[in-house]
UniProtKB/Swiss-Prot annotation:
<feature type="binding site">
    <location>
        <position position="204"/>
    </location>
    <ligand>
        <name>Zn(2+)</name>
    </ligand>
</feature>
<keyword id="KW-0546">Nucleotide metabolism</keyword>
<feature type="active site" description="Proton donor">
    <location>
        <position position="207"/>
    </location>
</feature>
<feature type="binding site">
    <location>
        <position position="24"/>
    </location>
    <ligand>
        <name>Zn(2+)</name>
    </ligand>
</feature>
<dbReference type="InterPro" id="IPR001365">
    <property type="entry name" value="A_deaminase_dom"/>
</dbReference>
<feature type="binding site">
    <location>
        <position position="26"/>
    </location>
    <ligand>
        <name>Zn(2+)</name>
    </ligand>
</feature>
<feature type="site" description="Important for catalytic activity">
    <location>
        <position position="228"/>
    </location>
</feature>
<dbReference type="GO" id="GO:0008270">
    <property type="term" value="F:zinc ion binding"/>
</dbReference>
<dbReference type="Pfam" id="PF00962">
    <property type="entry name" value="A_deaminase"/>
</dbReference>
<dbReference type="GO" id="GO:0006146">
    <property type="term" value="P:adenine catabolic process"/>
</dbReference>
<dbReference type="InterPro" id="IPR032466">
    <property type="entry name" value="Metal_Hydrolase"/>
</dbReference>
<dbReference type="GO" id="GO:0043103">
    <property type="term" value="P:hypoxanthine salvage"/>
</dbReference>
<feature type="binding site">
    <location>
        <position position="285"/>
    </location>
    <ligand>
        <name>Zn(2+)</name>
    </ligand>
</feature>
<comment type="similarity">
    <text>Belongs to the metallo-dependent hydrolases superfamily. Adenosine and AMP deaminases family. Adenine deaminase type 2 subfamily.</text>
</comment>
<comment type="function">
    <text>Catalyzes the hydrolytic deamination of adenine to hypoxanthine. Plays an important role in the purine salvage pathway and in nitrogen catabolism.</text>
</comment>
<dbReference type="InterPro" id="IPR006330">
    <property type="entry name" value="Ado/ade_deaminase"/>
</dbReference>
<protein>
    <recommendedName>
        <fullName>Adenine deaminase</fullName>
        <ecNumber>3.5.4.2</ecNumber>
    </recommendedName>
</protein>
Length: 349
């Protein structure tokens, strides 16, 4: 399969149609302004913004903290199980349209339990959407519970205990929210407990934080996958380790530009990550806030980086399946589908 023969003008359609997985999506970050307004009206809540347009205009944040401030405000409209279902269902419809065959979805229960929303309300709504997505859309999805790193480890232990009766409804835990001043080791004990429970482990590291945070996520949390991780290139020894151990990075290009991790997509290091042999993937992070779902991230990144071609598209999609937490047989089936798709593109030439 000689992918170098696929012309550059064929890339946009190829990127949109190829089967792929999404491994870094915060479900609360998929809340579009229209749905925020609809849920506020349904729950008789008064928003700080008089119109959908004024809310969308407020999305002009310039760093991670200013984004998080409006992100948590938007999440406040989620009150009932139906609200959580509607949010997840809207995302799954968008994912299906982008030819996502599998999604591993982050949710932030502490954002809601702190407002008095029962954990059961949150996870039952999300899980119902996932089951319906499997049955009606043919899309595979799983939940990853994220601890908020700006809160205490004691808070993380509390939400873990609340989650355990629903252990069959989520596959792992992650660590998100503001990196600065909240190093991975702050959560080493709760991650050790999650490891004992057989949960899969991921962590945000090396987005705002330094390469050292990635080392700590790997060594002190035993993270199997690093979310973001783009600062790894600052440390050649870390790059060697990531390549040797094939630790996946779930990279989010549009998010990185919106939050000023890179000045623009032309400066993004995703092509260099791939060239080093790192198992990098492309993801949307918080698509309602960062200007694009998964295909938009692929399209804009490939348009900005001429060194990315069909071979890199194949590698990114394959990486997304290989980095997922499904069993080997299912992964192999998806990779066969991917191979068939790319072979068909080659046969057209």
């Amino acid at each position: 399969m000689n992918l170098t023969n696929i012309p550059r003008q064929a890339l946009p359609e190829l990127l949109c149609r190829m089967p792929k997985a999404e491994l870094h999506i915060h479900i609360e970050g998929s809340l579009e302004p229209e749905l925020i307004f609809a849920l506020a009206e349904r729950n008789r809540l008064q928003l700080a913004y008089p119109t959908i347009e004024s809310l969308r205009a407020a999305y002009a944040f310039t760093n991670l903290q200013s984004f998080l401030d409006i992100y948590y405000a938007g999440a406040s409209v989620l009150q009932t199980e139906q609200d959580f279902f509607d949010m997840a269902w809207a995302y799954l419809l968008r994912a299906k349209a982008d030819n996502v065959v599998h999604a591993e979805i982050f949710f932030d229960p502490q954002t809601h339990t702190a407002r008095g929303i029962p954990f059961a309300t949150i996870i039952n709504g999300l899980d119902r959407a996932i089951q319906q997505g499997r049955n009606e859309l043919g899309i595979s999805a799983a939940l990853i519970l994220c601890f908020l790193r700006h809160l205490t480890e004691a808070d993380a232990f509390t939400v873990l205990e609340e989650a355990l009766p629903f252990r069959d409804k989520f596959i792992g835990v992650g660590l998100d929210s503001g990196e600065k001043g909240n190093p991975p080791e702050k959560f080493s004990r709760v991650f050790a407990r999650c490891r004992e429970l057989g949960l899969r482990l991921v962590a945000h590291a090396g987005e705002e934080g330094t390469a050292e945070y990635i080392w700590h996520a790997l060594d002190l949390l035993q993270a199997e996958r690093i979310d973001h991780g783009v600062h790894c290139l600052d440390d050649p020894q870390l790059v060697t380790r990531l390549v040797q151990q094939q630790v996946p990075l779930t990279v989010c290009p549009l998010s990185n530009v919106k939050l000023r991790v890179f000045p623009d997509l032309a400066a993004h290091n995703i092509a260099r990550l791939l060239a080093c042999g790192i198992r990098a993937t492309i993801n949307s992070d918080d698509p309602a806030y960062f200007g694009g779902y998964l295909n938009q991230n692929y399209l804009e990144t490939f348009a900005a980086l001429p060194e990315l071609g069909a071979a890199e598209a194949y590698q990114l999609a394959r990486n997304s399946f290989e980095a997922s937490f499904v069993d080997a047989e299912v992964k192999a089936g998806w990779i066969r589908e991917l191979d068939q798709f790319f072979q068909q593109q080659c046969d057209k030439i």
